[in-house]
């Protein structure tokens, strides 16, 4: 957002058609953004394209998958014209299985307590810091948060993780799964706290018009920029 003094905040150009125009140049660097939508609306594709466009510019990117194994994810994404497996082979896009990370940390319990959350945050931020990640996607934050004991712990987890990632200069997309019923009453997350903690909210969905199903993308919230 441009101030009276002419200040313009640096942007992370998403490279996604139409989105950068809406955001006046991209997502403000270091933001944590919720990408919310119901099943099949393109959330995972949005997140992967966000990483690919960064990798094309030589950025180190990371994808933490909690909903499907990384092998299956990569097999599915090969169909898209924008994706090139060479980016994975060269280490520009790094894909991590959350289940493997849980096992490595010894987090075998059904639900996570405060100590578990701190261990998980440290593991994620250590990976970001070691690789020099500037773009990160967690898909989905909903699946991850189902393992956290309480709403307050979810809030603490997301706030602390977002703050640390921002300090490291990492722009983050948190994929949020919502039902069509919730999307109709302006709820962009499953737990009701994710949207308050996030710097931005991008909503994906579809709507029927004259017998045709149309896809839409809406920026509901984005701190630091007009939209």
Annotate each predicted stretch with a short phrase:
Residues 1-83:
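The Walker A/P-loop phosphate-binding site
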């Amino acid at each position: 957002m441009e101030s009276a003094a002419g200040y313009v905040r640096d942007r992370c150009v998403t490279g996604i058609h139409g989105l950068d125009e809406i955001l006046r140049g991209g997502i403000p660097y270091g933001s944590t953004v919720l990408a919310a939508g119901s099943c099949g609306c393109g959330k995972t594709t949005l997140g992967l394209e966000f990483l690919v466009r960064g990798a094309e510019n030589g950025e180190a990117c990371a994808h933490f998958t909690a909903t499907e194994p990384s092998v299956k994810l990569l097999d599915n994404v090969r169909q898209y014209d924008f994706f090139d497996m060479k980016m994975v082979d060269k280490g520009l896009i790094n894909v991590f299985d959350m289940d493997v990370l849980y096992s490595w940390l010894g987090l075998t319990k059904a639900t996570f307590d405060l100590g578990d959350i701190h261990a998980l945050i440290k593991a994620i931020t250590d990976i970001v810091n070691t690789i020099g990640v500037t773009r990160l996607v967690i898909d989905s934050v909903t699946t991850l948060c189902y393992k956290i004991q309480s709403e307050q712990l979810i809030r603490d987890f997301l706030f602390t993780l977002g703050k640390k990632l921002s300090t490291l200069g990492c722009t983050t997309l948190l994929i949020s799964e919502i039902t069509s019923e919730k999307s109709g009453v302006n709820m962009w997350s499953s737990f009701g706290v994710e949207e308050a903690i996030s710097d931005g909210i991008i909503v994906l969905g579809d709507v029927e018009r004259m017998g045709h199903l149309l896809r839409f993308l809406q920026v509901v919230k984005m701190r630091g920029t007009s939209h």
